[in-house]
Curated annotation (Swiss-Prot):
Residues 1-100, 174-250, 333-413, 493-583 are annotated as: Disordered. This is Zinc finger translocation-associated protein. InterPro entries: SPIN-DOC_Znf-C2H2, Znf_C2H2_type, ZnF_transloc-Spindlin_int. The gene is Zfta. The keyword Cell division does not apply. Disulfide bonds: none annotated. Residues 66-78, 205-214, 493-509 have a biased composition (Low complexity). GO terms for cellular component: nucleus. Residues 187-200, 512-524, 539-549 have a biased composition (Acidic residues). Residues 557-572 have a biased composition (Pro residues). Residues 79-88, 573-583 have a biased composition (Basic and acidic residues).
């Protein structure tokens, strides 16, 4: 066998090819002289490139030779060497001009942009969000990061390495990308392959001996084989025996489990700002210090959106500052993540809400986990409660003996939306952990949108029509009076029972109780659409309210007065929801709203209409009494007065509405068409 015979070439004529080709230790073929007709170095049939040492040949293996462009027919039409193969995403012919137009994957994209390569579909997948990218282009990567998670561009190399290791652990791979199956049968084969690769690398590291000492390469290889047969094989047998004995199987599984938990913890910290507690198998928010009920992404998303949505806009440096501040407080972390001894919640039970006990007096609170200087430096300040809530929290903490003690556990404040304050005039009551209506002073038991809408529909439906400036003025006066009452030191009820206020008296009560509650509620129901209607509320009711609040120690301020509005239109009769009922239908179509059936009732014939639609009204009039369209304004006024009198006789005592003013002619008879309907 001639020197260098272990290398195959496809130039015609046989092995080695014609011409004075100079060979080296491992069968390398050096470039021939200009006079020779040899061929350029080419790949073998398996698509593997020649192994070239850069120390002896310089940059010949990375750039094409100038003479290679002028080759004859022996070059088989090849114009370029495989200079891109070292960077290709797969071995062989990748990114060869004229043959394969697909792009190739760069290894530095993994740590720089956190993009992993999937050989099965020749594409990339994002290690941050798990999305698949369509093309292997840098512009695609940057556009994806800019649209999905721009904050990841500001992560430090250490944080990116954490994400990469977490991704490998998620796929069951090692830190270097090798399959990690500890305690499995395939581990021995993988180690054998690694040893063979290591041996090949050592063989390539042998220095070239020149053209006349080609057999030295074979001697070097035989020497390596002898070393391998003497030391590697016994070590492999010992490793196989120990693994068959099962000694390292449990240890490897535990080590893999520990690495998975650590990588999961680092991923939650960098991506979700959540600290993972492996002992309790739960998450703790690094922004507010609260424990989450489970590890589901839905719970994480709901917690962030309800408690501190502003944390979603944090930039990379801000997140890094928050992570550093959280990592600098190990005492607070251990106090927070350690379950309380009297906690009856099993740590692995992820279906129930976590019940965290309050920290001790000397332990830092959850709000102190992110120091103020770090948050100010990051430019992010969490939402602060209103003045009334701060005063309430301070008052409660002083009564318990712990100043500014945060409430932990099932805190319903996380469900409170700040927009409810101006949109529905609802304030959070920190004492009862419920809502307080700033219109009537009523207390709502639950922090639910359905409860708010039902309360407004039943008590004061007219408050929905208040303008924005009027609602802002009401909220401002409420906050001022609440702060004034707290400054006076008025006692607050400790029990969660709702105190009976003059404005929250039930409409179903008999006698004078309902009559006392109705004028105030109807006054709010009469509130006009525009700011400026005159206040028709008598001063006697205000005096009665002030007198009734002092002995009872009411925790909420009295009802504020809006600015004087213009004269209001005729109010609707019922306190039920009438968002689709138009008051003008009363005089224009002689249609009244029936609160018991939530529909319309005709004042002419007493018929009931199913839907609150103008088309239904017109169809009813055309089919039943089309002559009513020709009524004069005087006739319509007469029908309205007769209907008011009939309604007063039928259900004036049931709280349907305040008694209508007496008609001009008290002795007027009812019209035949006026029928009283409940």
């Amino acid at each position: 066998m001639e020197p260098g015979g272990d290398h195959r070439s496809r130039s015609g004529g046989g092995r080695g090819g014609p011409g004075p080709a100079v060979t080296s230790a491992r069968g390398r073929r050096l470039p021939p002289t200009a006079a020779s007709g040899g061929t350029e170095p080419e790949e073998d049939d398996g698509g593997q490139a020649l192994q070239l040492e850069g120390g002896a040949l310089g940059s010949w293996g990375s750039t094409p030779l100038p003479s290679s462009r002028a080759r004859g027919p022996a070059s088989s039409g090849r114009k370029y060497s495989d200079h891109c193969e070292a960077r290709a995403s797969r071995p062989g012919k990748s990114r060869i001009p004229g043959r394969d137009h697909r792009r190739y994957y760069h290894d530095h994209w993994r740590l720089e942009y956190l993009m992993d390569f999937i050989p099965s579909r020749h594409g990339m997948v994002c290690m941050v969000c798990g999305s698949s990218l369509a093309t292997l282009k840098l512009s695609t990567i940057k556009r994806h990061i800019r649209q999905k998670h721009p904050y990841s561009l500001h992560w430090s190399p250490r944080e990116k390495e954490v994400i990469s290791n977490s991704w490998d652990a998620h796929l069951g791979l090692g830190a270097g990308g090798e399959a990690e199956s500890l305690g499995a049968q395939g581990a021995e084969e993988e180690e054998e392959e690694d040893e063979e690769e290591e041996e090949g690398a050592n063989l390539q590291a042998c220095p070239p001996k020149g053209s006349g000492k080609a057999p030295a390469g074979g001697g070097c290889r035989r020497q390596r084989r002898g070393v391998r047969g003497g030391s590697v094989a016994p070590r492999r047998r010992r490793l196989a025996a120990s693994r068959r004995a099962g000694g390292s199987r449990g240890l490897g599984a535990r080590r893999l489990e520990r690495r998975l938990k650590e990588s999961l913890q680092n991923w939650f910290r960098a991506e979700c700002l959540m600290d993972y507690d492996p002992r309790g198998n739960r998450l703790v928010c690094m922004a507010c210090g609260r424990a989450l009920p489970s590890l589901h992404l839905d719970d994480i998303r709901a917690h962030v959106l309800e408690v501190h949505p502003s944390s979603l806009g944090l930039s990379g440096p801000q997140r890094s500052a928050l992570l550093q501040a959280w990592g600098d407080q190990p005492e607070a972390l251990s106090e927070l993540t350690q379950p309380s001894p009297d906690d009856d919640l099993v740590p692995q039970d992820l279906t129930r809400k976590s019940r965290d006990s309050a920290p001790a007096a000397g332990a830092p609170s959850s709000q102190d986990l992110s120091p103020p200087d770090v948050k100010e430096e990051a430019g992010w300040v969490p939402e602060r409660p209103g003045p009334a809530e701060e005063e309430e929290g301070e008052g409660e903490g002083e009564r318990e003996g712990i100043p500014n003690r945060p409430r932990r556990g099932r805190d319903h404040r996380r469900h409170y939306q700040e927009r409810w304050r101006l949109e529905y005039l609802m304030e959070l009551d920190g004492c009862r952990r419920g809502l307080v209506c700033m219109v009537c002073g009523g207390a709502l038991a639950s922090l639910k949108m359905s409860t708010i809408k039902r309360h407004i529909r039943q008590r004061h439906p007219g408050s929905n029509s208040l303008s924005g400036p009027v609602k802002a003025l009401i909220a401002q006066e409420w906050s001022e009076k609440a702060a004034h009452l707290l400054a006076l030191g008025l006692p607050r009820p400790e029990s969660p029972s709702v105190p009976v206020a003059p404005s929250t008296a039930s409409a179903s009560e008999e006698g004078g109780g309902a009559e006392e509650a109705e004028p105030e509620e109807e006054w709010w129901g009469d509130a006009p659409l525009s700011p400026g209607a005159p206040s028709e509320r008598p001063a006697e009711e205000e005096d009665d309210e002030d007198d009734s609040q002092e002995p009872g120690g009411l925790a909420f301020p009295p009802l504020p007065l809006p600015p004087p509005p213009p004269p209001p239109p005729p109010p609707p009769r019922s306190r039920e929801q009438r968002r689709n009922y138009q008051p003008r239908w009363r005089g224009e179509y002689l249609m009244d709203y029936d609160g018991s059936r939530r529909g319309l009732v005709c004042m002419v014939c007493g018929g009931a209409l199913a839907t609150l639609k103008v088309s239904t009204i017109k169809r009813h009039i055309l089919q039943v009494h089309p002559f009513s369209m020709d009524f004069t304004p005087e006739e319509r006024q007469t029908i309205l007065e007769a209907y008011e009198e009939a309604a007063l006789r039928c259900y004036g005592h049931e709280g349907f509405g305040p008694p209508a003013p007496a008609p001009r002619d008290s002795g007027a008879d009812l019209k035949p068409g006026a029928v009283c309907r409940a």
